[in-house]
Amino acid sequence: MSEALTEQKSQKWAISLFTIGVFMAALDNGIISAALTTINESFSVSPSWGSWGITLYTLGLSVSVPIVGKLSDRYGRKKLFLIEVCLFGLGSLLVALSQSFPLFLISRLIQALGGGGIFIIGSSHILATLPKEKQGKALGLLGAMNGMAAVLGPNIGSFLLDWTGSWHWLFLINLPIAVLLVVFGACFIAETKAPEAKRLDAAGIFLLSLSILAVMYGMTNLDGANLLHSLGNPEVYGCIIFGILCFAALISYEKRVEMRGGDPILAYSLLRNHMFQRTLIIGLLSGGLLAAVIFIPSYVEQYLGVPAAKAGYWMTPLALASGIGAWLGGALTDKKGPVKTVILSGIISCAGFALFPLWVTEKWEFVIASVAAGIGFGFLLGAPLNVLVSEAAKTNKGTALGTLSLVRQIGLTLAPTLYAGFITAGFDQIGDEINSRLSDSGYSEKAMQMIPEIDSSEVSSLQEQIERIPVPEVKTAISDAIHASVASGYDHLYAAAAVVSLLVIAAISIPAFRRQKR
């Protein structure tokens, strides 16, 4: 009896430590965005160079996730968790102490290699140690922390920057947390790993890393404002084609490794599993839903008229709702199973995102819509997809979870570029919309000449120019035209997110319906 209580207490400690680790790692990619301008000025680099602080972290996460998942299955999840936290802490220290921008970028890469696997290790540990009826809630808790940290990162970064006056503290704050995680993790986390350990698939790791880096780098060079034109950029299509060829070579190689009885980094039999394939598709779509959240601050600023300094705070209702949704999704997965949970997630998120173009005109309406959307996609953040891939993977849970996380990251990288195209299209309509409204109202050519130059720039700068127009009627007509054009761009964006939610429902329900029919 006492042994059972001790084990239960140890499991609670382990889950708490994994939760803190997940929050710390997920927070770091968003927290830097608040200080990006300050960091660029500190190192005297351009914004385009400065953005590499985020891009390199994203690339590092993408590469490390599937590899760490496999290594944790092989060498032990506790051991890899402690190594990952140490790497993340070391990277944070080096970032804070960086005296040059190249060293800053290298340190960010070390951070990413350390933070990338923490969520995967925690999830696979839960799936390996907890009974099935308790896995959902625990995974939901991890998912809640992961989602909330990603959404709240910019706000927390702004607060710390205002409080300390230095961007270095955004990273130094990780050090005491990392030390405590290592100390308590060594004491309370039980070691778990896959039953067999064969020779490490070094060639597979190399091919997988090369494929991920090439595809993700190509995607980061896409331009949402000129999507079709950017696809003709050699840095885009060249990298993506090279990455696809590397992945094809990886599949061929891994098939031979598996046939010879080896231990591939990405099991060929797992990729052929239909449930695993469908779950990866849903994972890709879930990244698309998360990407829609990125545009919330600009939406409330440009459409609802919230000051830029306060726009980020309007992410809070959605962040809290996504955390609640992740927890509810975990509980529902335990009771009703992952398939029904995913279907309900799609229904709620579709309704939430659809409210943006169909209903939202006031701030209180925005809060209701964002809470509904947050609860909906929050369901997908933790339990249901993780349970689905682990059931398909059986023993190689870390590998399966790592692959799922990678695919979600691809969706999260690609979707903002596509969404930005909708916003750009809305801005491009501003000039025509203004001309049309003034002409319909019978204003003269002289009134037309009062219109400021429209170059699809910030709405706030356009509004400043409009305030200088002396004729109130002209001023009102132009303001209404700008508001309508901006609304058009965001309406299409969130309508697309609602469609993505419907695709989630289709991806999980159509195969289930076919199985029942048989």
From Swiss-Prot:
Name any one GO molecular function.
Answer: transmembrane transporter activity
Task: Set out the biological process GO terms recorded for this chain's protein.
Answer: transmembrane transport
Residue ranges crossing the lipid bilayer per the database entry: 13-33, 49-69, 86-106, 109-129, 141-161, 169-189, 202-222, 231-251, 280-300, 312-332, 341-361, 365-385, 410-430, 493-513
Record keywords, A-Z: Cell membrane, Membrane, Transmembrane, Transmembrane helix, Transport
Its membrane topology is listed as: Multi-pass membrane protein
> Mind telling me which InterPro entries this protein's record contains?
MFS (IPR011701), MFS_dom (IPR020846), MFS_trans_sf (IPR036259)
- Asked if Cell division is a keyword of the record, the answer is no
Q: Where is the signal peptide?
A: none
PROSITE patterns found in the cross-reference section: MFS
Keyword Cell membrane attributed: yes
Instruction: Give GO cellular component annotations, separated by semicolons.
Output: plasma membrane
Q: Which Gene3D superfamilies match?
A: MFS general substrate transporter like domains, Multidrug resistance protein D
- The main location is membrane
Cell compartment(s), UniProt:
Cell membrane
Q: Which family does it belong to?
A: Belongs to the major facilitator superfamily. TCR/Tet family.
The name on file for this protein is Uncharacterized MFS-type transporter YfiU
Q: Which organism is it from?
A: Bacillus subtilis (strain 168)
Q: Give the organism's phylogenetic lineage.
A: Bacteria, Bacillati, Bacillota, Bacilli, Bacillales
